[in-house]
Design a protein with these regions (language model features):
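Periplasmic-binding protein-like
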Residues: 1, 96-132, 169
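Hinge/capping helix and adjacent helix->loop/strand transition within the periplasmic-binding protein
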Residues: 1-63, 112-114, 125-158
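Short secondary-structure boundary segments
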Residues: 6, 79-81, 99-100, 132
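Conserved functional loop/turn residues at catalytic and ligand-binding sites
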Residues: 12, 57, 71-72, 91, ...
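Conserved helix-loop-beta element of the AMP-binding
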Residues: 16, 54, 91-103
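Short helices/loops that flank or line small-molecule/ion binding pockets
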Residues: 20, 44, 48, 62-72, ...
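Paired acidic/hydrophobic, glycine-rich loop segments that form the ligand-binding mouth/hinge
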Residues: 28, 74-78, 93-96
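Extracellular/periplasmic bilobal clamshell ligand-binding domains
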Residues: 170-182
Length: 182
């Protein structure tokens, strides 16, 4: 979720990019450090949108939040599950989410693509992998057992509450996902 400090006079990603293009280097965005997800995702967004913002790297997300909430930086992109607390409290404004679809935690917040500023669709995902030479019968058993775990209603609900979408992909689907995203 892309968050803006609550007193920033911008209420949409489209307006933010318009302002940033007209005022290069005037807006800043925090990250949890150089190379972190909170750095790479917005850097890609600003690049694709043709906007020049100042990157302010912190040593972790907590320090970035302190300065966003204190109004010392303008923007911060973080996981929706973490951002939710601050968005719901009204201490920041949510401008966009990075996934292909709106996030259930922030159903009124448009995606980056919906905002029309960049063709950017990025989501975090986790997978289980085994060495290439693992026998197929072991791979099949692991896949089957993991699918049973992922299908459990309590686990599904835990993922949803945290803003996640639990998926159980077969080998071909997983290979396609890795080829697309990695």
């Amino acid at each position: 979720t892309l968050m803006a400090r609550k007193d920033l006079p911008i209420n949409s990603l489209k307006d933010l990019v318009t302002f940033a293009k007209a005022n290069p280097g005037k807006l800043s965005y925090a990250s949890a450090g150089v190379g972190s997800g909170q750095h790479v995702l917005p850097a890609a967004l600003w690049h694709l949108a043709g906007a020049d913002l100042i990157h302010v790297p912190y040593r972790g997300a907590q320090a970035a939040y302190l300065d966003l909430l204190g109004g010392r930086v303008d923007l911060f992109f973080d996981l929706s599950s973490t951002a939710r607390v601050h968005v719901n409290a009204g201490s920041v404004k949510a401008l966009a989410v990075s996934g292909a679809e709106r996030n259930p935690m922030h159903p009124d917040v448009p995606t980056i693509v919906e905002s029309g500023v960049a063709p950017l669709d990025l989501e975090s995902w986790f997978g289980y992998f085994v060495p290439k030479k693992t026998p197929m019968d072991i791979q099949d058993r692991l896949r089957s057992e993991l699918a049973k775990v992922i299908a459990q209603p309590d686990l599904q609900e835990t993922f949803r509450k945290a803003g996640g979408k639990p998926l159980s992909l077969n080998a071909d689907q997983t290979r396609a996902l890795v080829r697309r995203d990695v």
